[in-house]
Structure formats: C-alpha cells, structure tokens
C-alpha cells in the first residue's frame, strides 16, 4: 500500500470494506466471476474535501492486495485503512483482478492520474489470466456508500480461437497472415 505514515492521511474509526460484482463473460478460458475472484489490486486516492483530479496520485492505497478465501468470506487486507472522520473528505478507487497475475505490470505511487496496466499474454493457457477491471469510483465518502466500496468489474480481454479446416486435403499449405479488424461495438 501507500506510505502509511503520511501525516495527512485520514485515521478514522470505520475500516474500508469492499464488495465485487463481475459482468458476465461470453467466452473466456478460466473465466473470472464474482464468486471465483479471490484477490484484487486496489488503488485509492485520498483528496481531502477536493474532487479527484488527474494530478492526484494513489496516496492511500497503491496496488493493495485485497483477498478472500472463498466467495462467502469477507475481503481482507493489511494494513487496514479507515474512512476519514471528516464527512466531507473523499477517497477515490480503482481495482483490477486477479491480483498480480503473471505478465501484468501496474503503475506505482509516483504516477499521477488513473493507474495504468500493461499485460503480456502468457504462452501457456494455464498461465493466462481472465483480467477484470473496475473503472473509477470517484469522490467516495462513508455516507455515499455506507462504508462499503463496491467494484463492478468488467472483462478486459477477449479470447479468440481460430480453427482452420483444409477441405481440399491439400498438403504443403501454410497460413502466413491472419487479420482481424477492429470491432469496437462487438458487431460486424
């Protein structure tokens, strides 16, 4: 997490609590669902009574590992962070899951603005993650969500399987290029 000894960080009496939902995937290997997600990385920005801006840094939590043992157990993390005592003070959140899969590089405490992620697909299918992300939950207060930060995760990747059939039974053929166009809206 971020530096826990920073003097301007809130030390309230009510701990931050987390919840997660995951949108339904259409086609993924080792699909991440709300019940199968057991860990996530959380970024939190404490901004006092100011709204989140692009110049803010993750000074409250930075890639904090938040985990649970099963879908019925609570989310836990250490050290525990608390909601500010001042009801006007705000904390903004981002999250991704699962926490730190192979091939994922995430930004640190020195980067301003939203966290950035770079993911390299692993060669072995067993090492590939179904990465889910939650966009910003800006300017949260204890009163705005009754103390529970609820992330709505979305699948960041798409799995594409290509099957080629040689109907002529010809030999010596090689596929040298395969191209997919940009399908931003999911339609052709």
Name every feature range the model reports, one short phrase each.
Residues 1-188:
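Sec-type signal peptide cleavage vicinity
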């Amino acid at each position: 997490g971020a530096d826990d000894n920073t003097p301007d960080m809130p030390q309230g009496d009510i701990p931050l609590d987390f919840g997660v939902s995951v949108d339904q995937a259409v086609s993924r290997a080792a699909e991440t669902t709300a019940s199968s997600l057991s860990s996530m990385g959380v970024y939190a920005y404490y901004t006092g009574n100011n709204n989140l801006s692009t110049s803010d840094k993750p000074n409250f939590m930075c890639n904090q590992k938040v985990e649970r043992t099963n879908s019925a157990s609570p989310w836990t993390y250490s050290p525990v962070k608390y909601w500010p005592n001042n009801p006007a003070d705000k904390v903004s959140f981002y999250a991704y899951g699962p926490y730190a899969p192979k091939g994922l590089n995430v930004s640190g405490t020195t980067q301003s603005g939203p966290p950035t992620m770079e993911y390299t697909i692993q060669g072995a299918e067993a090492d590939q993650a179904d990465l889910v992300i939650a966009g910003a939950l800006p300017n949260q207060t204890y009163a705005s969500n009754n103390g529970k930060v609820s992330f709505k995760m979305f699948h960041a990747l798409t799995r594409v399987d290509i099957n080629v059939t040689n109907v002529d039974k010809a030999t010596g053929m090689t596929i040298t290029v395969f191209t997919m166009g940009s399908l931003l809206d999911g339609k052709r």
